[in-house]
């Protein structure tokens, strides 16, 4: 960890705990800051706040009192989930208290170079793929960021011999000023989190912060299959490297069933351990990063052929009575569902879908639904999805929850069929997270297995 004195004896406010706030509080205390943590959860229900108090860090819980900002704070470290129109954030900015992100804090202390991955879909899979390939090539890659390991915590332990492979959400990137990864990846961009950002343009602007400080000595890996993303190459100082499943590009690409990097054949697409065209995209982005890091084709091919996926992201769960189950609970939007379906023969697929109603009519999903064996629909958006199913000529059944849907799907299935949970909707109408939704699918599979 770099020794920096910027925060020594300075009063710093941590707004919102969760994993990243807790990690930031400990790091700033270690750097000599006078830390105050403010979290809305009551103290008696807040084990993280209790632990920090025991470590000598001041904690204020239960509300966000504006008068707290009357203290002379040097800066505020904001939880990524707290919006910039939050009264505490607005008041802090009015008082000229600078807002720092936890990701920026990690960058300031990290001795290790950073590879940053962002985008609307595919971030976690691509981040994990990259780390696996680098580690297989004897480069010490450490996962960090939105993938579940607070960046500021990982950065403290990292040395100059390590590499931080960091998944970055738009929430984390918004507000970064000094953050400068050596390699950055943008997997794709579709309208997401508009309730947070307000518009697609503002969402793109948040994602674009990833390259804000990059120079021509840094590399920006871009999806050339999306004209929007491809065009960003004209707007960066970084050196662009492309990936594409449709055309030969200056970077990684798919041609005649093989994955290439700059005319050098790396591996066959058929060797990839995960189905779906979107996973070819993820693999190509990984290949681009791996080749920039000097990893051999043999290591890349071997690692990607054995890569079995990430939990809740087109995760192969198992096979029961020759029926195969896939858990793609992370499919919280239409594009994710489209990409999941692209990996299968629709005539064998029973799709479990539905969730939080955000007003989508799902018309753009209709062509991808054509030919499905059946759909099992649930959640607030079920009626809208039924209209899409009708347009696609697909029959459907209702289910009260994922567990019931899984059982119904299995009753409808024949040997050789695929039961795919890919909701195309957020989970919050029925479940606290996509993880809990996916866990119910896994538990339902285990229950069916126990009955078999």
Swiss-Prot record:
Which source organism does the UniProt entry give? Streptococcus equi subsp. zooepidemicus (strain MGCS10565)
Protein name stated in the entry: UDP-N-acetylmuramoylalanine--D-glutamate ligase
Gene3D superfamilies with a match to the protein in the record: Mur ligase, C-terminal domain, Mur-like, catalytic domain, NAD(P)-binding Rossmann-like Domain
The pathway to which it is assigned is:
Cell wall biogenesis; peptidoglycan biosynthesis
Catalysed reactions, as listed in the record: UDP-N-acetyl-alpha-D-muramoyl-L-alanine + D-glutamate + ATP = UDP-N-acetyl-alpha-D-muramoyl-L-alanyl-D-glutamate + ADP + phosphate + H(+)
Which GO BP terms, alphabetically?
cell division; cell wall organization; peptidoglycan biosynthetic process; regulation of cell shape
* Keywords, ordered alphabetically: ATP-binding, Cell cycle, Cell division, Cell shape, Cell wall biogenesis/degradation, Cytoplasm, Ligase, Nucleotide-binding, Peptidoglycan synthesis
Q: Where does ATP bind?
A: 119-125
Looking at the UniProt record for this protein, which Gene Ontology cellular component terms does it annotate, in alphabetical order?
Answer: cytoplasm
Function (record text) = Cell wall formation. Catalyzes the addition of glutamate to the nucleotide precursor UDP-N-acetylmuramoyl-L-alanine (UMA).
């Amino acid at each position: 960890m770099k020794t920096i004195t910027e925060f020594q004896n300075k009063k710093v406010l941590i707004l919102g705990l969760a994993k990243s706030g807790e990690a930031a509080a400990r790091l700033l205390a270690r750097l000599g800051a006078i830390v105050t943590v403010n979290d809305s959860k009551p103290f008696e229900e807040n084990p993280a706040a209790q632990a920090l108090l025991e470590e000598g860090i001041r904690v204020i819980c239960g509300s966000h009192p504006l008068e707290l900002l009357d203290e002379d704070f040097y800066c505020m470290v904001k939880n990524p989930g707290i919006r910039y129109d939050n009264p505490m954030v607005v008041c802090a900015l009015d008082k000229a208290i600078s807002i720092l992100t936890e990701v920026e804090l990690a960058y300031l202390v990290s001795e290790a170079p950073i590879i940053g991955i962002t985008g609307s879909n595919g971030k976690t899979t691509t981040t994990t793929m990259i780390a696996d390939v680098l580690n297989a090539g004897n480069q010490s890659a450490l996962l960090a960021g939105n993938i579940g390991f607070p960046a500021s915590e990982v950065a403290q332990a990292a040395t100059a011999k390590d590499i931080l492979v960091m998944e970055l959400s738009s929430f984390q990137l918004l507000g970064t000023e000094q953050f400068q990864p050596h390699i950055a990846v943008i997997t794709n961009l579709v309208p997401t989190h508009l309730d947070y950002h307000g518009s697609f343009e503002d969402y793109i602007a948040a994602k674009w912060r990833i390259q804000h400080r990059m120079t021509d000595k840094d590399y920006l890996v871009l999806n050339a299959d999306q004209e929007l993303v491809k065009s960003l190459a004209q707007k960066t100082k970084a050196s662009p490297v492309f990936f594409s499943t449709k055309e030969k590009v200056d970077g990684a690409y798919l041609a005649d069933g093989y994955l290439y990097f700059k005319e050098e054949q790396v591996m066959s697409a058929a060797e990839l351990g995960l189905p779906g065209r979107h996973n070819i995209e993820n693999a190509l982005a990984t290949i681009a990063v791996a080749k920039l890091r000097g990893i051999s084709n043999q290591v890349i091919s071997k690692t990607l052929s054995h890569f079995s996926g990430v939990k809740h992201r087109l995760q192969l769960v198992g096979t029961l009575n020759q029926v195969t189950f896939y858990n793609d609970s992370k499919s919280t939007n239409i594009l994710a569902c489209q990409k999941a379906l692209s990996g299968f023969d629709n005539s064998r697929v029973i799709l479990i879908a539905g969730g939080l109603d955000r007003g989508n009519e799902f018309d753009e999903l209709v062509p991808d639904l054509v030919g499905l064996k059946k759909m099992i629909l649930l959640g607030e958006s079920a009626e809208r999805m039924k209209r899409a199913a009708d347009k696609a000529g697909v029959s459907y059944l209702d289910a009260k929850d994922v567990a019931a849907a899984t059982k119904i799907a299995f009753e409808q299935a024949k040997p050789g069929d695929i039961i795919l949970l890919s909701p195309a909707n957020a989970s919050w109408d029925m479940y606290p997270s996509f993880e809990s939704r996916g866990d119910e699918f896994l538990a339902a599979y285990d229950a069916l297995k126990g009955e078999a």
